[in-house]
């Protein structure tokens, strides 16, 4: 991959030994080897994906060529029937556009009302119906709960710590 000979590899090893020292050189070699391994696997993956994409593109191109060839090699009977179908589809399309049933259906189902600007004009001649019974709910007072009494901090007596027995208090 890098086209390095034995003498060049030996020279790089000696320079690395002088620069890094005998303790850090093995760690550096492992790190560089890991980088090279990762680059190789990445290059292989990219190469495989490109190869698959090229094969897929070639397959699609050949498929298109076969489809075009099969359409040009149709029998005259099939060509005539395809032309008839195209003409029938176009005539149906033209008649559908000319007699658009959806527009006619929308127009037939549209309710035409004059715009009412005044609220009183909308309710002209309408009287409200009288209610036979009026709904009511029983009157209840909300329940009150007594609030807890809190003693002020001034009434509280400070507690003093009891002296602890020590060895000097003994007789």
UniProtKB/Swiss-Prot annotation:
Family as reported in the entry's similarity comment: Belongs to the TatB family.
Membrane topology: Single-pass membrane protein
One BP term from GO: intracellular protein transmembrane transport
Name of the molecule in the record: Sec-independent protein translocase protein TatB
Region annotation Disordered: where it falls in the sequence: 117-171
Assembly description: The Tat system comprises two distinct complexes: a TatABC complex, containing multiple copies of TatA, TatB and TatC subunits, and a separate TatA complex, containing only TatA subunits. Substrates initially bind to the TatABC complex, which probably triggers association of the separate TatA complex to form the active translocon. A complex containing only TatA and TatB has also been identified. It could be either an assembly intermediate or a disassembly intermediate generated during translocation activity.
Domain of life: Bacteria
Gene Ontology CC terms, in alphabetical order: plasma membrane; TAT protein transport complex
Effects seen without this gene: Disruption blocks the export of seven endogenous Tat substrates.
TM region positions: 1-21
NCBIfam families found in the cross-reference section: tatB
Main location: membrane
Keywords tagged on the record: Cell inner membrane, Cell membrane, Membrane, Protein transport, Translocation, Transmembrane, Transmembrane helix, Transport
UniProt-listed InterPro entries: TatB
